[in-house]
Amino acid sequence: MAREFSLKNTRNIGIMAHIDAGKTTTTERILYYTGRIHKIGETHEGASQMDWMEQEQERGITITSAATTAQWNGHRVNIIDTPGHVDFTVEVERSLRVLDGAVAVLDAQSGVEPQTETVWRQATTYGVPRVVFVNKMDKIGADFLYSVKTLHDRLQANAYAIQLPIGAEDDFKGIIDLVEMKTYMYNNDLGTDIEVTDGFPADMADQAEELRGQLIEGVADFNEELMMKYLEGEEISIDELKAAIRQATLSVEFYPVLVGSAFKNKGVQLMLNAVVDYLPSPVDVESIKGINLDTEEEITREPSDEAPFSALAFKVMTDPYVGKLTFFRVYSGTAEAGSYVKNSTKGKRERLGRILQMHANSREEIPMVFAGDIAAAVGFKDTTTGDTLCSEKDNIVLESMTFPEPVISVAIEPKSKADQDKMGQALAKLAEEDPTFRTETNPETGQTIISGMGELHLDILVDRMRREFKVEANVGAPQVAYRETIRGAAKIDSKFVRQSGGRGQYGHVVVEFEPNEEGAGFEFENKIVGGVVPREYVPAVQNGIEEALENGILAGYPVVDVKARLVFGSYHDVDSNEMAFKVAASMAVKQLKDQAKAVILEPMMRVEVVIPEEYMGDIMGDVTSRRGRVEGMEARGNAQVVKAMIPLSEMFGYATSLRSRTQGRGTYSMHFDHYEEVPKSIAEEIVKKANG
């Protein structure tokens, strides 16, 4: 089978937005205009739109699919869904890993909002080129130039308008294209009757000329040839300007801004043109790097069909029709349905059963995938999010996504016996889809504990369990994932001797413990000289230490960032065995409590609260009362932003408290930042509670 679209004509994009900027409608309209069946103008008076939308409402395909494939102007556009809420930054990060470019959607009334900033910063970290779509131009208070200004003021983004709206709010009736110098007038609300004229409308010509001048000046910074022409007053052709805007956008230091109203079907086709004109194809971005498992060397995989097959699984979903779907992005090479590939992350062989591509209102089974494609596989057994897939001959592991450890846990119990069995299956499926969601059974109480990235994260998962798996469950009070560590060094001599007639037990170790660097985890070194502890017992010593650290020394929380050195010991020819050394090692850990200054650590959250100015004093006081540190404040438009570091244990119920303090006008976002030592008085309470 030959390729349908060349790599150069492929675009893998995400739609990024704040919760209410209109991301869903924008995505729906993109799919409507690129739909293979309903090309605009083929059907009468919008009948096509209505039936499509009804089917859409019944099945909800576009919004639930992790990646949808569409066509536009001879290009293939794969749209990867990105969530809009901050508890799901992991979802956002994982989609940013597999897309090449993005459309940032803003609300024309509010411009850049707090969540926009978080997502924007993540996209900058991953070096993702963006175009900006200022949506909801028909809304009361919509102001295009103000929105462009917020990009400069709040994100310090080098953003330039490449379009200008004609009218605003109810009067929004057209768009001026500053690049091609054309005017688009919309004569109906379906976006089907469009009148295109060359030049600018007379009453807006001055403003349009001025903005076009600013655009050329802005883009000339990235292109010397254009700069010379501009300074010498020569005519710059439309093609030259487009090429220069593309070059500047790909540098991730220049952002073209477009305008429209997805709901009223205005500006979406022009935005699709911009996606094709200015966003990168897989060939324009840096080739993916990975580690060759055989040689341990870093290697690069070129985006080409001739290169060996390599792909990254970026989302696992459970589909009611076909079961487990694994969405993956192909970086190099090709693979056929029915063939075997290797999951190099897990070292397992997987069969690529069927390959599906999701379209706006259908799913298509395809015989093979090519470099740059995004598709879903049916039939994978062991593959989870972040795993690398490659050809069986060429071992490579692409840099995997790193997922933060969950910071909040709750106990969950089924409401009835019937729910009991279903709950286990539901939790297993949800954990498979979301790497930051963990589920475990507490061995002492038999309770099921679920852990995640925040209260909202867990609420939504419990809600999905009810909706998708029909499991009713009661949820307990949230618990914080504390950790323990040591602040001092200690040399501990630990002997385990048991003699009760017949063969005894004998294990003796001397272990030096000291704090490791933050985040470095547990390190074990064997410094035994002269075989005083036989080599075959050393793994048992390490094992004993690790298990004991996992069970805590103060309050039963895992101990992190510790170095252990086995320096001396002794053994008995008859009575020594692995078990005895394991017990001796774990007894050594118990003694750390008094000898190595053991402390409890708690997760600290980076919190941003956005509030109207009059609540400033109240909120600052509240942050302090929650043991928080205010780390900065800034004015953002007419609101104030308070940035603070607050312990997670003090953040429960904050959403409700903030709502009542600010009459519902405050918003906040928080994400895990680091672990910090708990103050003595609180540590004593935690220990008391843990040890009952």
Curated annotation (Swiss-Prot):
Function noted in UniProt: Catalyzes the GTP-dependent ribosomal translocation step during translation elongation. During this step, the ribosome changes from the pre-translocational (PRE) to the post-translocational (POST) state as the newly formed A-site-bound peptidyl-tRNA and P-site-bound deacylated tRNA move to the P and E sites, respectively. Catalyzes the coordinated movement of the two tRNA molecules, the mRNA and conformational changes in the ribosome.
Subcellular location: Cytoplasm
Protein name, per record: Elongation factor G
CDD domains: EF-G (cd01886), EFG_III (cd16262), EFG_mtEFG1_IV (cd01434), EFG_mtEFG_C (cd03713), EFG_mtEFG_II (cd04088)
Cited SUPFAM superfamilies: EF-G C-terminal domain-like (SSF54980), P-loop containing nucleoside triphosphate hydrolases (SSF52540), Ribosomal protein S5 domain 2-like (SSF54211), Translation proteins (SSF50447)
Family, per entry: Belongs to the TRAFAC class translation factor GTPase superfamily. Classic translation factor GTPase family. EF-G/EF-2 subfamily.
SMART domains documented for this protein: EFG_C (SM00838), EFG_IV (SM00889)
All residue ranges annotated as the tr-type G domain in the record: 8-283
PROSITE patterns on file: G_TR_1, G_TR_2
Gene3D superfamilies (alphabetical): 3.30.230.10, 3.30.70.240, Elongation Factor G (Translational Gtpase), domain 3, P-loop containing nucleotide triphosphate hydrolases, Translation factors
BP GO terms, sorted: ribosome disassembly
Entry binding sites for GTP: 17-24, 81-85, 135-138
A Pfam family of this chain: GTP_EFTU
Cross-referenced InterPro entries: EFG_II (IPR041095), EFG_III (IPR009022), EFG_III/V (IPR035647), EFG_IV (IPR047872), EFG_V (IPR035649), EFG_V-like (IPR000640), EFTu-like_2 (IPR004161), G_TR_CS (IPR031157)
A molecular-function term among this protein's GO annotations: translation elongation factor activity
PANTHER family: RIBOSOME-RELEASING FACTOR 2, MITOCHONDRIAL, TRANSLATION ELONGATION FACTOR G-RELATED
Annotated keywords: Cytoplasm, Elongation factor, GTP-binding, Nucleotide-binding, Protein biosynthesis
GO cellular component: cytoplasm
